[in-house]
From Swiss-Prot:
Family indicated by similarity: Belongs to the SURF4 family.
Free-text note regarding domains: The di-lysine motif confers endoplasmic reticulum localization for type I membrane proteins.
Name under which the protein is recorded: ER-derived vesicles protein ERV29
Disordered as annotated region, ranges: 11-31
Phylogenetic placement of the source organism: Eukaryota, Fungi, Dikarya, Ascomycota, Saccharomycotina
Motif (Di-lysine motif): 307-310
Gene: ERV29
Amino acid sequence: MSYRGPIGNFGGMPMSSSQGPYSGGAQFRSNQNQSTSGILKQWKHSFEKFASRIEGLTDNAVVYKLKPYIPSLSRFFIVATFYEDSFRILSQWSDQIFYLNKWKHYPYFFVVVFLVVVTVSMLIGASLLVLRKQTNYATGVLCACVISQALVYGLFTGSSFVLRNFSVIGGLLIAFSDSIVQNKTTFGMLPELNSKNDKAKGYLLFAGRILIVLMFIAFTFSKSWFTVVLTIIGTICFAIGYKTKFASIMLGLILTFYNITLNNYWFYNNTKRDFLKYEFYQNLSIIGGLLLVTNTGAGELSVDEKKKIY
């Protein structure tokens, strides 16, 4: 290549900073970045507009009349799986004892005591949570029942069982956070900001959201691509607390649809019925947690809440 002068010259002629050999490329990249940024902003605006439209459905006159009953209905959904499990143990008492004693080789006395304690604990704990009485003890007892049954029955072998149990615990935490009484002190008629109850509720809601999302990891990739896309968007938004009401509605509708169409245990009379019934009520518990979040909001540890501050 022939000599083209010192650095900064082209053919011996000095160049201005705006006429360098790479200035066109730099300008192109700048325009491209601006174009990409514009597209992302447009997508964000369209998404927020669509999300707001979905959230607006909750302002319907019929929904508004039902709103006072939503927390109670949500809590009942959350604990429905515990009622179902208790009644199943009682109705299949001899089968439960035979399975744990003969197949799992637990001592007979231990099996009887375990089943009695678990059944009574689930019935009492679920009832207390629905009535919002002693919710801290009720939540602890129900979480202990989930973990102890998983250990005794050996339900840690299947990933779907484990993730679903974590999601049920997430629903319990959300129900517990909803029951926290906001005892805010006042000074000069001004409410106390960032009370301990608010922070505790925020942490519980965040933990509950993350645990509920775990179930959708196994659920998502076994469905159609359209459902996969919607579920991924919904789970990300729900986990970080961005457009949380929209995410809760979308995930709740998706899970309700598949729960009714796939876990329709009422059409079966064989052993498959028990398995489908188990999955149906566990999914109903998760739906209850999602429904409760639409009413309570995402809490302090969320993008939605931070946007209000900043």
